[in-house]
Curated annotation (Swiss-Prot):
Protein's organism: Nitrobacter winogradskyi (strain ATCC 25391 / DSM 10237 / CIP 104748 / NCIMB 11846 / Nb-255)
One cellular-component annotation, GO: plasma membrane
Record-stated family: Belongs to the Lgt family.
Presence of keyword tRNA-binding: no
InterPro entries noted in UniProt: Lgt
Bilayer topology term: Multi-pass membrane protein
Protein name: Phosphatidylglycerol--prolipoprotein diacylglyceryl transferase
Amino acid sequence: MFLLITYPVFDPVAISLGPIAIRWYALAYIGGIMLGWLYARALLRSEKLWGGPAPISVVQLDDFILWVTIAIIVGGRVGYVLFYNPDYFIRYPAQIFQLWNGGMSFHGGFMGCVAAVILFCRRHGLPILSLGDVATAVGPIGLFLGRIANFINSELWGRPADPGLPWAMVFPNGGPLPRHPSQLYEAALEGILLFTILALMIRLGALKRPGLVLGSFIALYAMARIVAEFFREPDPQLGFLWGGLTMGMLLSIPMVIIGLAIVYAAWSRGSRASDAQASPNSGASTKVDRD
């Protein structure tokens, strides 16, 4: 007889401040944005990592935070509506705005982030690839916290596992079968492993090649997500799609190709010292108050 790990009981509310209740997923978003902001500021302050002054100032980064926060939330929600449950939201459109009931998509949030980077850079005359590098370098922080929140909320659990698997567990809403804690797999792959790889790349000079961190994040995240999807239970309203693939796999496969193409272009282009992608105004912008 196998002994299964008992799923721990968590209070759905992480922090209570009088009538205000902050749930774990909201706390993950807040923590991811705040920690990512601090890490991004540290990257921009290190001229050694860029081979000179960073093409984006800390003040400009501070302005960008509001843009990307809105983009992640709106994009994540729109992505979930379009990719995962369009029929339901066509019948109940008012539910689209009820974010507290759950339903966010990484792929939608990422596309929102891409749009925010492009629009912000065009407005302020900044290099798109360099801001994309910074934004994706901090991405694994939010991914890690988000997956931990998924685990605490007992959602997005894994497929049924062999009862002999030492860490298999029975989730409250997952039926009587022991399941893979796929949220923790994703936290390890998309969060810890991806952050470590990108941090090592940055230490070795990746920021000197605009787009290298961005492309690596896109490709490596997609690969990690595809692997995790083999252990994750598909969304019940979708199930398995073509050839046994899941929606997460279908959305991630193109990301591998796009990411590798960006990596190839970044490596072929050369370092920032010889790169003409920086806008004419970027040199002046690095001389403003860098906080």
